[in-house]
Each structure stands twice: as structure tokens, then as C-alpha cells.
Amino acid sequence: MRVMAAMSGGVDSSVAAARLVAEGHEVIGVHLALASTPTTLRVGSRGCCSLEDSGDARRVADALGIPFYVWDFSDRFREDVVDPFINSYEMGETPNPCLRCNEKIKFQALLDRGIALGFDAVATGHYARLKDGELRRAIDDNKDQSYVLGVLNDEQLAHCLFPLGDTRKPDIRKEAEAAGLVTASKPDSHDICFIPDGNTKAFLGNHIGVRSGDLKDQDGNVIGHHDGIYGFTIGQRKGLGLPGPAPDGKPRYVTDIDADTGTVTVGTRDDLRVGRLYADRLIRLDEHEGSTQECQVQVRAHGGVVDATVTIDDGVATIDLHSPLTGVARGQAAVIYRPDPDGDIVLGSGTICDTVSVSKLQPTTAGASSNS
């Protein structure tokens, strides 16, 4: 099989490429250059698109004896990932750019070019499994990345390889050390690659500018002001800019963001509890149109799952949670799973477009305990 190994410069993609070579596939290594200018490359940072990462990926490819290429997808990355990220915050949403990058860059732009060049598949170092054409959770629950792959469609999955899905992370590092790969002890990346200092608010402020609005309590009283809704996300507690503590002394959290009026509403933790989600922009859920199923839903990359009743109607998923979630924001992905003893199966995903608080639902719609 002719395989493109997407090599980020980290230990996971390095071992994935090494395994493919050992299995006898015809492999080339590809590193994606996503920064638009040299100043945005994160020299020395722990990420997936810095100059250091590119060099590490090249050294691994040389050690494996495979061709290595750097493909410039910076324009596509700006258009399909960075700009939508900014626009989403302008609309009061909280997007995950890594999911968008997987959907539009790593498994669309890269795959399209690879197929045009005669390759059969793209392989990455993601922790997930493909079995009988179904995307499943990885063996290593602590590293499972099926959530961030829930945005892939059937055609993309048909050309994917995830060589690490049956292995735990500590064993991957041991394998890299045994093979003498330079990335064996390299730390994992956790930040957003195009925000090198991790200051999302400053990044958005530089692109959007000041757009003042009001901070209100649950009764609609103005209790403060802000410079832009992009500085807030649902569930946020710190940095609200309130002039003083709440009268009852309880912490205050962001409970709603209204992009039309520029209003940010705050309340107690109880006000954050939601019992129903609505999701649109559905992926791989068309076959379930008109159906109601008992499933599980995950709304954060490193969050837990909750049981839910999912109804698909007219391209929108209504997700009734069996126990409440807190801090759920519009723009997050809701990935739907079907429990399975051989690894939970990803049925598909949608983008959360609305939520309903527990207080607005019948008491029996969602349970009494909260999950984060």
C-alpha cells in the first residue's frame, strides 16, 4: 500500500510512520507548513507546526529511510481554520480549531493531494481505531482521540490509517526509544498552534478590536461592562471584570453570550447545568434521520461521556441528556457514540447550536448530578 505518513514532529506520528515502514508499505513522510509567515512559526515551542517540529520530522524520516516533504498549506489553513475560529468567537461560540484542522486540512486537503498523486491512504499518530469501517475509541482511554476525529466523513475514514490505536502511550515512547528516534522523549503538545503564547483573548482582540458590551445578571440587571464577547466562554469564572463579589458571595460564571446585543450574562454554577443540546452541521448522521436512539455524547476532547437520547430530525440532532452537563458552549462539537465492548463506536458528530438549561426542562428530563 502507498501511504502518506503525516509527520508532525512528535513521537506519536514518528512511531506511526516507523510501524508502516516495518510492515512493508511504500511510505513517504509529509510535514504540513501551516504558518503564513516566519514570525508566526513557533521556534522552540511544543506544537505541531514549528520550525523545530519540521526539523524533528525530517530527522525521523531520514532515520527510517523514507522520502520527506514539507507541503505549504498556510493559505488553506488560514482560510479553513484560523478565519472560521475568529468568526466563531465573534458569534459568541467556542470552537475547537483542532477538529476543524482535522476535517479541512489533515484529512481533506492532505488526502485530496495524496489521492491525486496515487497514494492509497493517510496515516497519522492519532489514538483511535478503525475496525470494519467504523471509527472506535483507542485502547488507551487516557489518550483516546476519537472525539477530535468525529468530524471525519465516511470517504475520509475509508482512506485513513491509525497505527497506534491498539497501543498505550507509555509503550509508544518505549518503542521510539528502542528505535532510536529523536522524538522519543519529546513532550506532547497541548496549545493552539497559531496562538503561540496561549493568550486567546489577546489574539482575538488583535483581529476583532474593541466591541464593548454589558455584563448582566440572571435578572437582566447591568452589573459591568466588557470590551468584546470574544473574551468569554460559557462556564468561565475568572477574568470576568466584575466590580465586586456577588451579593450572596457565590462565584459567578458566564452562562450566556448574545452576539446580537453584545451581552454577556453571568450566574451561579447551577445556572450552567444543561439538560438538552441541539446540534446542526451533522456529519455521518444522515442515515439516522428520523430516528431516536439511546447513545452516549461527548462535548469536550478530554471530557467524559454521558448517556443521552438522540433524535435526528431535519438535519438537527436533539440530544436529551440523562444527567446534566455544565459549561457547554455553542460551537463545541457533540460527538455521538454507541457503546461497544470492542471499543465505543463513533456514529458521527454535530456542532452545538443551542442548549436548554435544566431549569427550563421537566425535572425528569435530566438527572440531578452534573458531569463536567
Swiss-Prot record:
Binding positions (ATP): A6, M7, S8, G9, G10, V11, D12, S13, L32, G125
Coiled-coil blocks: none
One Gene Ontology CC term in the entry: cytoplasm
Disulfide bonds: C101-C193
Active site location: C101 (nucleophile), C193 (cysteine persulfide intermediate)
Gene3D superfamilies (UniProt xref): Adenine nucleotide alpha hydrolases-like domains, HUPs, Translation factors
Cell compartments where the protein resides: Cytoplasm
Site (Interaction with tRNA): H126, Q332
A GO MF term: ATP binding
CDD domains noted in UniProt: MnmA_TRMU-like
GO annotation, biological process: tRNA wobble position uridine thiolation
EC top class, as a word: transferase
EC number in record: 2.8.1.13
Function field: Catalyzes the 2-thiolation of uridine at the wobble position (U34) of tRNA, leading to the formation of s(2)U34.
Family: Belongs to the MnmA/TRMU family.
NCBIfam families: PRK00143.1, trmU
Protein's name in the database: tRNA-specific 2-thiouridylase MnmA
Species this protein is from: Corynebacterium kroppenstedtii (strain DSM 44385 / JCM 11950 / CIP 105744 / CCUG 35717)
Gene name of this polypeptide: mnmA
